[in-house]
């Protein structure tokens, strides 16, 4: 796993702390993480796609965590925490197999709209990659995907050393009533 140059490291922010955890979401963050996961379905650039908002609650998070563990995988999460409120305002997740796999998959990254502009996306992704390197040093590649219109996340991925290797198109058809 090639990590970014030291100059690419984001600087700390006085307003936010970064918390990392593996597999199980801390109980105190469950409701907050459910709200963030709901916003993941509506607050990201969707390229004109129409999607239904997802419903997340603490039970769904725990069920998802159990399903991932049962499949022999682990979830690494980094969350941005507002120091003043103690509230989770951003998160990112990585998944990898627990069997020594050399691959990991970057999944969600979300910063609440009202907390953007503090480099939280970069900070949480970097913290999670650091966590991955510590806990799973055998991982050599991280696969991620991104919408072309999400220029902010594409820029973050560039800063972190990701390289485009393929393209995927999504099509949606609207049926008339």
Predicted regions, residues:
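Hydrophobic alpha-helical core bundles mediating ligand binding, dimerization, or RNAP-core interactions
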Residues: 30, 34-37, 64-65, 125
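Conserved acetyl-CoA-binding loop-helix of GNAT-fold acetyltransferases
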Residues: 111, 117-131, 159
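Conserved GNAT acetyl-CoA-binding A-motif
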Residues: 103, 132-145
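Acyl-donor-binding surface of acyltransferase catalytic domains
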Residues: 1-28, 168-173
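Actinobacteria-biased recognition of intrinsically disordered, low-complexity terminal regions
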Residues: 87, 174-177
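Conserved beta-strand-loop-alpha-helix junction that forms the acyl-donor binding cleft
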Residues: 112-116, 142-154, 172
């Amino acid at each position: 796993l090639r990590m970014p140059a030291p100059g690419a490291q984001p600087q700390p922010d006085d307003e936010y702390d970064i918390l990392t955890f593996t597999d199980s979401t801390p109980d105190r963050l469950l409701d907050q993480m459910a709200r963030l996961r709901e916003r993941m379905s509506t607050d990201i650039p969707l390229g004109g796609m129409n999607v239904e908002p997802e419903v997340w609650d603490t039970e769904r998070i725990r069920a998802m965590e159990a399903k991932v563990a049962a499949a022999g995988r682990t979830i690494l999460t980094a969350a941005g925490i507002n120091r003043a409120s103690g509230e989770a305002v951003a998160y990112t997740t990585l998944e990898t197999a627990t069997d020594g796999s050399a691959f990991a998959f970057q999944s969600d990254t979300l910063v609440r709209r009202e907390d953007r502009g503090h480099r939280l996306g970069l900070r949480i992704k970097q913290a999670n990659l650091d966590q991955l390197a510590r806990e799973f040093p055998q991982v050599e590649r991280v696969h991620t995907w991104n919408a072309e219109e999400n220029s902010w996340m594409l820029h973050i991925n560039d800063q972190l050393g990701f390289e485009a290797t393929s393209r995927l198109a999504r099509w949606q058809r609207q049926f008339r009533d």
